[in-house]
Amino acid sequence: PTVSSLVGQLYEPGDRRLDSAYTIFYMGVNVGSFLAPLVCGYFGETGNPQDFKWGFLIAAIVTVLTVVLFETQKNRYLIGPDGKPLGIIPDARKERPQADNTARKSAHANGRTMRNYLLLALLAIALAGFFYWCFGDDWISIGIFTACIVFPVSILLEGSLTKTERDRIFVIYIIAFFVIFFWAAYEQAGASLTLFASEQTDRVILGWEMPASWIQSFNPFFVVILAAIMPGVWGALGKRGMEPASPTKQAIGLLLLSLGYLVICLGVKDVQPGIKVSLIWLTGLYFIHTMGEICLSPIGLSMVNKLTPIRFASLMMGIWYLSTATANKFAGTLSGLYPEAGKVKTLLGYRIETMYDFFMVFVVMSATASLILFLLSKKLQKMMHGVE
């Protein structure tokens, strides 16, 4: 099982603390995200690109230590509500008895399975051919986009799913689609925003110039702070019956992402070429983006855990992260629109000549996705069948 799904198994189904639990888990993840750019930037930004190899070595060492820590301590801390260790065999008692077990054992089960495999194989071949026509021999894109469709379809073909389970899985798929737009804009942090920090941001503080890579630590620093606050906020709203449903929280996250880019648009508007903008604009962007991330990412992990039948817990968590992989690929494409002197780039007829034009792409994209998700929230809540 994935670590993300293990967090959900620490609680009973329907436990209202799950959103807060995933937020705390997310805070822990971002402690590492905060330290990594500082360490790698310290060893790597020496003027010699080859020195970044030490960053990879440090990452490998820490990964090995993490695996050792997990394996030696899991039986002590990963204990479910019933007192049993987690991550071995799914406890069927935790799953609501909605599926008809006799249907799973029907005489047609084997034939249906073979038919499903054949359909999935044909679908994969057809999609791979279509994406090859779209992207040429970009096999990474072909693989990611094909998997993003084939794996979700494979779960829907499962004959044991009830209508309620199918509806809940559809909710995950729909929100995962919108999450692609969030991460495609958000992950400019590792591409165009880092380039912007390096080339067009004044990073001098009291005579000392901050390495551009260190700005990557702003976001996880804000995550750790806000993640300590948000569980209390959601808990207080829940006690008053005012806590937003998961789809609404996701829409709020997208809206905050759009507002963050609007802030940086104000910072770069009418700035003359060669003039660097204040670091405060980029700091404001990262702070607002972090608020959006806290509303969307840990809540999304919690939602997947709450809506997924336990027999598909790890697979559905993988599909959720597959949407992030798609978003990162999309983010790379969008970062290619970064303005260059003497070049005019376009997106759907929109001309991109300045940083203002570039950042407005993400303002509009995120705001549009947020508005549509807000409009769909009520319908999605009904499809969740009582899960909050």
Question: What positions do the PLM features span?
Answer:
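Loop-to-transmembrane helix entry/capping segments in MFS-fold secondary transporters
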Residues: 13-25, 52, 206-209, 279-280, ...
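Glycine-rich segments within core transmembrane alpha-helices of 12-TM secondary carriers
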Residues: 17-38, 44, 58-66, 121, ...
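Transmembrane alpha-helix termini and helix-breaking/packing motifs in multi-pass membrane transporters
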Residues: 35-51, 129-136, 228-236, 330-350
